[in-house]
Regions:
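A residue-level detector for conformationally permissive "hinge/kink" positions
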Residues: 1-2, 105
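RNase H-like nuclease fold core
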Residues: 2-43
Length: 152
């Protein structure tokens, strides 16, 4: 299970998108860094974060398969419905022409039923704690969820 998020300009001094990715339930991993590409929109930035998350989850899926011989579908949460729509919709739209076709790796994973992407309300997005200046109480709540493996 993974959580993917991005933020533009939320951190002092950054003028490019930050992304954060959290994986939990068993293996815990996270990272927060500036994106390697210049996104032309917030949707593209969210989609880039989804791409990196999907690649990591695919690696984890293969590791689980090698260790247990069980195939599992990975679940990835994002708080951007437009990014979900782009990932799930094969129809070309003029408004998304700037999104690089190599990013459609996510579509292939969805089509092969190796990945499911679900919307998660921004207030429940635990990856926000890595990209945004949240109130202390919200950050503590997110950390408790991450480290206790409790459900959202």
């Amino acid at each position: 299970m993974g959580f993917s998020n991005s933020d533009w300009g939320g951190a002092e001094g950054y003028k490019s998108f930050l992304e954060s990715i959290i994986y939990y339930h068993g293996t815990i991993g996270w990272r927060s860094h500036k994106q390697k590409v210049v996104a032309l929109s917030s949707v593209e930035a969210e989609y880039n974060a989804l791409l990196e998350s999907a690649q990591d989850l695919e690696w984890m899926k293969n590791l689980i398969f090698e260790a247990t011989n069980k195939k599992v579908q990975q679940l990835l949460f994002t708080d951007n419905q437009s990014a979900i729509s782009i990932a799930s919709n094969h129809i070309y739209h003029h408004g998304t022409r700037h999104i690089n076709f190599c990013l459609h790796f996510i579509r292939d994973l969805i089509e092969q039923q190796n990945l499911k992407i679900q919307y998660l309300d921004t207030n429940k997005m635990i990856a926000d704690s890595l990209t945004k200046n949240n109130p202390y109480s919200k950050s503590i709540k997110h950390l408790r969820i991450i480290f206790s493996n409790q459900d959202l």
